Amino acid sequence: NSCSWKFHEYIPSAWETYWFSNIDKFQYEVCSILARSDQVNITIDVLLRIISFQKEIFDTNSQRMSIDNQFSKMHYRGICSNKEYNASQLIEPLVGLIRDPLTMCPHIPSVSSNLYLHGEFALQSKRFLLLAPSSSFQIDPSLTINIASLAPWLYTSGSQKILIDIGSSYFKSRNENTAEIGTKWFYDYFKEKSIRFNRIIAYEYEKLETRRVWDELPDDVYSIYTFINVGVEVEMEKFNPWKMLEAIAKPDDYVVIKLDIDKPPLESALMKQLLGKKNPAKYLIDELFFEKHISDNRKSKEDKLKDSYELFTKLRQYGIRMHG
């Protein structure tokens, strides 16, 4: 209770730096680069490490592994009882298409078939996402703190845990597609970690059956769920998600946002708005899930993979655990 933490800096791993520094070239040959033996070996080791992390809340007594050096890090500084502390927490590196590297590309003969997913579960793979509750962290000098499922720089006891799902569809799935990252996936993941949201806000542009919306909710979600069957807007009025966030969240809250509305111009405008100098919303977000729509056609004027790397890096540099 006597500690005060602030985000300090984002430091990409050498693996991420390798991709980012070569992205002008790599963005047109992602699959062939990922298939190189040096990339395959790192990919498998990092993927298996994330899968093991995902299964439980991170234990500060867990054994460090050399593969952890391939992860990027969010760095924090804290003051506890007038003493300064430095902390770092792992996050998945931005590599390949900024998603599970063993999806979206042809199968690599040297990779065991049991490491591949199929169909929608490959397209919507969540195996490469390292959320904060599962993420390894270190505090220097060591500090005996009671970690109540979330690191102290992300959440203060007594504050809120908020999920905002922009493009939510129904709670369980959109068109019965249970492979998607939807509200239920977040609910299940956090419930497994004994973390309960205090508030869930769901935006959906498509007109949904009101009765079904509420019937699909688990009993413990009903009282904390706000459903807004109106599309989000970039104008800073009542349907702007950043304005809503500013109204309901405080810096000590743990805020998770998913943005997936399948309207690239609006998504891009909202992201640009979030990065605006005068927009305080970016300092309220802890984890943000977003898949930027891009083109691999050299002649296209659409955004390229390089634009995704730049966007994700900027947001991570503001302290947001940005996931693709």
Segment roles from a protein language model:
Residues 200-204, 257-259, 288-291:
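Extended hydrophobic secondary-structure segments that form protein cores and membrane-embedded regions
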